[in-house]
């Protein structure tokens, strides 16, 4: 884990896992635009994901938990929107227990497949087990996205053991239930079908995302296109966006040739990194001030 007091088990996750997942989603979008279908599955037997690590949540401060849930939601939203934004459809292939944040992770996928065996079930047990509501979109997605009846949603959220097999399909919790003996083959077939039906344009070459260069000091962070100045006495962070120093690319070929050094791409990556740093390492800074500098004509 990121701090003492917990150990990641049963495919549970913490902020570190979600940072890796967010990085993967962005790399699928930019480095592998030829990919049309992404299958999300577990590398462990008998468990898909147990969700957010309970001991981590118990040991974390309130502000850490709030920012953790926000970042987790943003990551879920990113791959949920990937089909519309970048033509990549995400499939959740569930074998084993899929509970709490683990099921919320699957709910953000565009298609959910569940194997039909004695150990595979989906559930949101936060209310009966922890007396809290699901924190990363579970209730919203089962009713608004999957169109589950609200009375069934109430029952579902009160069941500790979750819902299996045909009932999960009947309650609209999953899109497809497959016999365990045919599950892996069916997942492969469905992925190929979705890829064949995709109207995403064929792209053979992506943009490799290299590591960001930054310098962290006691009173700020310096990137190529962003400066972050920390004023802890006033609990304020000043984020300065610097304009481009070279003309914009004339066409897509020039933009692709610039790779991860293209101004807008690098600026957005640096800004995302700076915001993540401020959220979790400078939580006492309650005011962020955004400024810009540079030649306005260079943006046009």
Show the residue positions of the predicted features:
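Amphipathic alpha-helical segments at domain termini/boundaries
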Residues: 1, 104-108, 147-259, 263, ...
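Short acidic/His/Gly/Ser-rich catalytic and metal-binding motifs that mark active-site loops
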Residues: 1-2, 47-51, 123, 132, ...
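Short helix/loop segment immediately N-terminal to the Walker
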Residues: 2-7, 81-88, 252
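Short glycine-enriched, charge-decorated loop/helix-capping segments at active-site entrances
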Residues: 5-11, 55-62, 254-261
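Asp/Glu-centered strand-loop micro-motifs enriched in Gly/Pro and often flanked by an aromatic residue
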Residues: 7-16, 242
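A structural preference for short, pocket-lining loop segments at secondary-structure junctions
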Residues: 14-63, 73-93, 115-118, 236-239, ...
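Short, glycine-/Ser/Thr-/acidic-enriched flexible segments
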Residues: 45, 112-113, 119, 127-129, ...
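Conserved catalytic cores of soluble enzyme domains
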Residues: 63-203
């Amino acid at each position: 884990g990121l701090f003492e007091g917990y150990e990641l088990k049963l495919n549970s996750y913490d902020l570190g896992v979600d940072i890796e997942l967010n990085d993967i989603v962005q790399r699928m979008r930019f480095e592998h635009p030829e990919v049309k279908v992404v299958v999300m599955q577990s590398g462990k037997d008998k468990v898909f994901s147990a969700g957010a690590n309970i001991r981590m949540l118990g040991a974390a401060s309130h502000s850490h938990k709030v920012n953790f849930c926000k970042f987790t939601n943003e990551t879920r939203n990113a791959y949920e929107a990937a089909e519309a934004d970048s033509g990549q459809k995400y499939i959740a292939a569930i074998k084993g227990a899929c509970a709490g944040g683990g099921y919320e992770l699957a709910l953000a996928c565009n298609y959910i497949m569940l194997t039909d065996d004695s150990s595979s079930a989906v559930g949101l047990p936060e209310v009966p087990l922890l007396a809290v509501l699901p924190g990363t979109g579970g209730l919203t997605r089962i009713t608004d996205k999957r169109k589950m009846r609200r009375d069934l949603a109430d029952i579902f959220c009160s069941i500790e053991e979750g819902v299996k097999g045909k009932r999960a399909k009947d309650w609209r919790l999953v899109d497809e239930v497959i016999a365990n003996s045919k599950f892996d083959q069916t997942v492969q077939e469905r992925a190929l079908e979705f890829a064949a039906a995709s109207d995403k344009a064929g792209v053979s070459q992506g943009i490799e995302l290299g590591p960001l260069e930054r310098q962290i000091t006691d009173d700020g962070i310096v990137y190529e296109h962003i400066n972050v100045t920390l004023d802890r006495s006033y609990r304020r962070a000043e984020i300065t966006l610097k304009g481009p120093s070279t003309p914009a690319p004339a066409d897509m070929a020039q933009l692709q040739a610039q790779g991860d050094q293209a101004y807008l791409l690098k600026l957005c990556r640096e800004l995302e990194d700076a915001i993540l740093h401020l959220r979790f390492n400078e939580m006492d800074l309650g005011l962020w001030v955004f400024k810009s500098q540079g030649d306005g004509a260079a943006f046009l």
